[in-house]
Amino acid sequence: MEENSKKDHRALLNQGEEDELEVFGYRDHNVRKAFCLVASVLTCGGLLLVFYWRPQWRVWANCIPCPLQEADTVLLRTTDEFQRYMRKKVFCLYLSTLKFPVSKKWEESLVADRHSVINQALIKPELKLRCMEVQKIRYVWNDLEKRFQKVGLLEDSNSCSDIHQTFGLGLTSEEQEVRRLVCGPNAIEVEIQPIWKLLVKQVLNPFYVFQAFTLTLWLSQGYIEYSVAIIILTVISIVLSVYDLRQQSVKLHNLVEDHNKVQVTIIVKDKGLEELESRLLVPGDILILPGKFSLPCDAVLIDGSCVVNEGMLTGESIPVTKTPLPQMENTMPWKCHSLEDYRKHVLFCGTEVIQVKPSGQGPVRAVVLQTGYNTAKGDLVRSILYPRPLNFKLYSDAFKFIVFLACLGVMGFFYALGVYMYHGVPPKDTVTMALILLTVTVPPVLPAALTIGNVYAQKRLKKKKIFCISPQRINMCGQINLVCFDKTGTLTEDGLDLWGTVPTADNCFQEAHSFASGQAVPWSPLCAAMASCHSLILLNGTIQGDPLDLKMFEGTAWKMEDCIVDSCKFGTSVSNIIKPGPKASKSPVEAIITLCQFPFSSSLQRMSVIAQLAGENHFHVYMKGAPEMVARFCRSETVPKNFPQELRSYTVQGFRVIALAHKTLKMGNLSEVEHLAREKVESELTFLGLLIMENRLKKETKLVLKELSEARIRTVMITGDNLQTAITVAKNSEMIPPGSQVIIVEADEPEEFVPASVTWQLVENQETGPGKKEIYMHTGNSSTPRGEGGSCYHFAMSGKSYQVIFQHFNSLLPKILVNGTVFARMSPGQKSSLIEEFQKLNYYVGMCGDGANDCGALKAAHAGISLSEQEASVASPFTSKTTNIQCVPHLIREGRAALVSSFGVFKYLTMYGIIQFISALLLYWQLQLFGNYQYLMQDVAITLMVCLTMSSTHAYPKLAPYRPAGQLLSPPLLLSIFLNSCFSCIVQISAFLYVKQQPWYCEVYQYSECFLANQSNFSTNVSLERNWTGNATLIPGSILSFETTTLWPITTINYITVAFIFSKGKPFRKPIYTNYIFSFLLLAALGLTIFILFSDFQVIYRGMELIPTITSWRVLILVVALTQFCVAFFVEDSILQNHELWLLIKREFGFYSKSQYRTWQKKLAEDSTWPPINRTDYSGDGKNGFYINGGYESHEQIPKRKLKLGGQPTEQHFWARL
C-alpha cells in the first residue's frame, strides 16, 4: 500500500522528450503554512526570500506529499543534470460553465475523437478536469493512465483515416466550445512585463541581495564614497539589464502579436463556412486556405496542395511544396505511416502560404493539429522564453571557486570575532568588523566577470557579420576541437552547373550529352523527366525553387506557364504546365501537365510526379533522386549492368549525380490517379539515365580547412549526398590529406538467417582527380595487414551503415568515430545523432551548415553556425551572413579570446579578494583598516576599470595548435592563484613585521610624539610635515598607521601586477599593448600610486590617510613591489603558461587526457589489428550463432539508446518537425 502511494506521488511529464520533467504531488497543510508565516515575520521576510530562490523548500515546508490525483500543488524537477525545480498550482475547469448542456452519461464521449485526452481526463459526475500550466503549456490529469497529458493538440495516435473521417467535416459548435475551454486560446501571448516586476526580479537576484547587504554594512561604517560608487554602478547595471529585458520582451511580443489577430475561415459541422479570429481555433477544426496567408496554427493538409515559405523557422528561403495526407484504410498512426516524410503534409504556424492549388474538389483544406504554444512557432518562442542552461565546466568551476572564497570569508569572520573580543571591543563593533571581513573575499563584480569577455566578443563577431542569439556559447567555441560541415552550399558552391546527361537505351549507357556545347537536351523521356520532375513554382512571373531543380529545368530550355491560363484548355485542375521554349530542342509534345507531386525528402532521397503529355489520355510517372535509390525502384532489366562502375566514374571526380526514371500509368481517370498511394506509383519504373552536375568547392574552403588542420582541429563532413562524391570532395579540399588511406565501412542489416554484417573496404588508388578512377579491392572474410601509411586512415560510411552499426555494432561506434571523416547519405535525424555520439566521446563539436536539413544538428552541437543571409536564424546559436566557412575560424578565435579573457578576469578578481583578505587579516590584528580613499582607489580606479577593459583585447589572428584550458580547476590556473597568493602573503607579512622593527616606528595614537622623537630620521621636508601632523588625532586611530602606509602601496601595485600578468596575449589574444585603454589605465594607476608614495604634499597625504615616511623606506616599498612583479611575471609567463613544459611534465609523470576520444586513440594506436581492412565481420544477433569478432567488442562501453528503424526520428523537440 505504501509502495503504491509512493508510486502515485510521482509521475513523468513529457516522457522521452527533450523537456521531460518529474512531477510530485503535494497537498497544502494549514499548520505548516501557519508556522512558515510566523517564521517569515520573525525573519523580516528573509524566509520568503529563501523560498523565492528555492521553490522546492517552499513546497516541502508548506505541504505534505500525496498522490497526484489529490494534489493541489505540484513540484516539478527537470531530469537533466541541472535538476531544476518549479512549483505549480493545480486548478479545475468546470464544463458546467458552458452555455449549452453537457452530457453527464458515462458512456457518451464529450468530443468526437473517443481516444482524446479530454474524454479520458473528464471527471464525472462533476464534469471537471484537473489542470496545470507549465512553461505556457496546459496539461490535464488523466486518471486512467495516472499522469498529466498535454492538451491543445490532436493525438498522434490518430490514423490517416481518422483525420479524414473524424475531422474531415469539421467540429460541431458544442465540441468547439468544449475544446476552447480545455485547450485555451490559440494565441502565443508574450507579456510585456511591467518595469517594476523586472526591477524586483533583478533586485532579488542572490548576487544583488548579497551586494545590498555588503553596501549597507559599508555605509554604516562611513565608507560613503566607495559605497556610492558601487551603488551608482549597480543601479546603472540594473537599469541596463531591465532595459535590455524590456526591449527583448517588446520585440518578442511584437513578433508574435500579429499571429493572434488573423481572420480565418473554418468549416463548422452542419453549419458550413464561418469566419472568426484565429485565437478561437481549436485542434480538429477544418481550416480553409485562401491565397497568400500567414498560418496561425499547425495544421495537416487533407485536400489540395500549397507552397509555403518556412524561412522564418529554418532560415531556408526556398519555397516548400506541401501535399495532402493520403486516405489510407489502416490503423497505423499517421506520423508512423508517413515516416520522416510527414512534414511534407504539415503546415507550420508562423510560415507563409504563398500559393495554393485546389484539387478540383473544393478549396484547399487542412485540419488544425496544434494551437498556441504547442505549435512549431510556440516551441520556438518557448525556447527563447525558457532557454536550456548550458552545461559548461567553466560555470560549475566558477561556483566552486566562489564557495571556496566564501569559506575563506567565514574563516575570516571567526578570526575577526576572536581578535576584537580579545581586545575588548564592544560586541556591536566586533560583529560589524567581522561582517566587513566576511564581505572582503567575494568581490561584488565576480559573477559578472565570466560574461564580460562575451560582450566584447559578440561585438567583434557582429562586425564580421556573425550574429549570436546565445552569448553564453561564445566561451564554448574556445574549446571546439572538432567541426562538422555540411557539403552542398557549405564546402561547395550553392549553385550547380550542368555538365551533361548520360541516357540509357537497350539496357546500356549511351554517349554523354554535354551542356558545354550550349545545346539543350534533345527530346526524349529523359528530357520530359527533367522538364517536369521538380518542385518549382511560378510566382509573380518568376520561377522559384531549389537551385538544383532550377539548373536542371534550365537545361531543357522549356518554360513554365501560369496554370490558371491554360487549365480550361486541358480540361483538368493542374499544378504546372510546361511548354517548349524558343531554344528548346524540337519536340512532338505541345506541353506537359504535372498533376500530382510526391515531394523530395532527405530520408527518402527521391521525388516523383504524375504528369500528362498534351493530347494523350494516359499518364506518366517521372522520378528523380539519388542514383542508388532510383535504381532500386526500377525494373532490373532496364538498369545497365555497369551502373555501379559508371556511377563511380563520375562521383569519384566530385560530380553530383542524379538518376531519372519513368513509367506509363494505364489509367484514363484523373480521380483514380489522385488517390494512388506513393508506393504503387513509385514501382516498376524504367531507368532513363543520369544527370551529371558539377559542384565546385568554394574558394575559401581549402584555406579554412588547412587553417583548422594546422590548429589540430578535426574536420568531418556530414552530407546527404553520395558517398563517393563526398569522399572526392573531402580529398579535393584536403579534409582527407594526400597519401591517407580511406576505408569505406559498409554495414548491412540482419536478414532471416544472416546476422548484421560490417565490411571494411579499402580504397586503393588514393591519387584521384578528373579522369582518374579509384580501384576497389576484393572484399572477403580475411584480414589484410596494414600497409605503409596505415597509421593515417579515415573511415567513410553512409547513413544506412551508420544506423546498422548504431544498432548492431554499438561497441565499434567510438572506434570508428575517432577516425571517421566522411558520413554521406545522412538523414537529419542521423546528423543530430552523430553529433551527440561525438559529444559522448568528449569532443567539443562545432557544426556548420545551411540551416535547413541541418537545423537539428546545429542545435545539438556546442556551437552551431548557420550560413544564412538572415541576421539571426533560429535554427542555430550563430548565424553568418557571409555564406562561406571563413566564419568558423573567426568564431573559434573569438571564443578562445573570450575564454582566456574570462579566466583572466576571474583569476584577477580571485587574487583581488585574497590580497585584500590578507591585508585585512594583518591590519585587524592591530584593530586597523585601510582608509576610505585607499579602498576607493583600489576598488574603483583599478579593479573596476580592469574588469571593464581587460577583456577588450582582440583575438590573435592565427589559431594556435592547441586549445586554452577549459577548466578553472586545472593545475596551471590553481598553481597560478596559489603561488601569487603565497607571494602576496610573504611580501605583506614581511612588510608588516619589518616596519615594526624600524627605529622611527610607533603606534598611531603616539604619532605626534613619535614624529618629534624621530625628526632627524625623516626626509628633508620637515617643516611641511610639522605643519599638518599635529592634527593627526582628527583622523581615526584605526586607519592612520605605519602599517597601512606600508601595506597600501604594496597591495595596490600587487593589484596592477596581477592585472598585467593575467592579461597574457599570444597565442590566443593580441599583445597587451594593443589594448590601448587597458594599457593606459594600468600605467596611469601605477604612475599615480608611485606619485602618491613619493609625494610630500599635505593635501594628498591627508586625503589618502597616509603617514609620511623616510625616502629610503618608500624606495624599499617600491623595490619590493617591483621585485614581486618580476618574480610573478617570470613564474606566470615562463612556467605556468609554458605549454611545452606542461606537455613534458605530463609525459614524464604519465598523465594522459581523460577524454574518451583520447583514450580510444591511445588504445587503437597500440592495437596492431586496427584498422581492419578488406574483411567482413558479423554481429551475434543472428539465429545461427555467427562468430563475433571479440577484438572489437568492449565491455567498457555502455549500451546506448537505439535508433528507430521504421519509426519516427530521434529528435522529439520542435526541430524534428521541421
Swiss-Prot record:
Its EC number is 7.2.2.-. GO terms for biological process: intracellular calcium ion homeostasis; monoatomic ion transmembrane transport; polyamine transmembrane transport. Disulfide bonds: none annotated. InterPro entries: ATPase_P-typ_cation-transptr_N, ATPase_P-typ_cyto_dom_N, ATPase_P-typ_P_site, ATPase_P-typ_TM_dom_sf, ATPase_P-typ_transduc_dom_A_sf, HAD-like_sf, HAD_sf, P-type_TPase_V. The gene is ATP13A5. Pfam families: Cation_ATPase, Cation_ATPase_N, E1-E2_ATPase, P5-ATPase. Mg(2+) binds at residues 850, 854. The active site is at 486 (4-aspartylphosphate intermediate). GO terms for molecular function: ATP binding; ATP hydrolysis activity; ATPase-coupled monoatomic cation transmembrane transporter activity; metal ion binding; P-type ion transporter activity; polyamine transmembrane transporter activity. This is Probable cation-transporting ATPase 13A5. The keyword Transmembrane helix applies. It comes from Homo sapiens (Human). Glycans are attached at residues 540, 669, 819.
